[in-house]
Amino acid sequence: LYISGGAALSPAVARTFFALGVPIYQGYGMTETSPIISVNKVGHNHPNTVGPALPNIEVRLGEGDELQVRGPTVMKGYWNREEATKAIFTEDGWLRTGDVCTIYPDGNIRITGRIKEIIVTSTGEKVPPADLESAITSDRLFSQCMVVGDDRPFIAAVAVVNPDEFKTVCGELGLDPAKPESLQDPAFRKAALKRIKTSTAGFPNYGVPRQVHCTLDAWTIDNGLLTPTLKMKRNLIRQRYTAEINALYDTLVKR
């Protein structure tokens, strides 16, 4: 029996293990909840969710679709940190997880992003990035992806390209994969955007990236762009690609 937690389970990874006859059960929790809140189980495994809440845990949606929980395994508070304790609990005693989610009628919980990570465009559209990024990386061309768009007129993306698939696409387009400039060739970028559009077909139009910057440089723990639990350090990635991100918007505005 394999349980996955700590970071979101990639749908591609889940499918691979399922095909090998090794089911993985994704769960979810926090240190403050000792630590499990929900988990999939045998006969009730939906890998795109973190399963239903444990029998002794109550869950609800708070403001902004934030997942809030209460139950006997939830902490009483932070030791000698009164202000932090007040901040994490609602007035009626529910713990704020900080995660945006959907709770389905069957009780399954799907985490769609962090409250602080929600992208708000300059037109006021709100886009939770996690689901969008997961959809994009379901395409084998993209191994990692971060979408951007805060205070911008539309959503764009920075994506790490799978080297093997990059070579395949370059061959189809008559480009040389050994040349770094092929990544930014208009033909390749058009092909990348087409694949992004296909993989995000179920999202509203305002949530689909209209521009993408591609790179072959993976984001890792060693280069400081991933946490030890393999979560993206969004601020650092944005800083690393500031010029490239600005260029995505400048290019479209000038057209």
Predicted features along the sequence, with ranges:
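Ser/Thr-glycine-rich phosphate-binding loops at phosphate-binding pockets of nucleotides
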Residues: 29-33, 97, 121-122, 227-229
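Gly/Ser/Thr-rich phosphate-binding loop
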Residues: 1-45, 58, 143
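Conserved C-terminal "lid"/linker of ANL adenylate-forming enzymes
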Residues: 119, 144-147, 153, 193-255
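Conserved ATP-binding/catalytic segment of the ANL
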Residues: 53-121, 138
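C-terminal boundary motif of the adenylate-forming
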Residues: 100, 105, 139-165
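Adenylate-forming
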Residues: 74, 108-137, 166-186, 205-209, ...
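Alpha-helix/helix-capping structural signal
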Residues: 7-8, 73, 164, 236
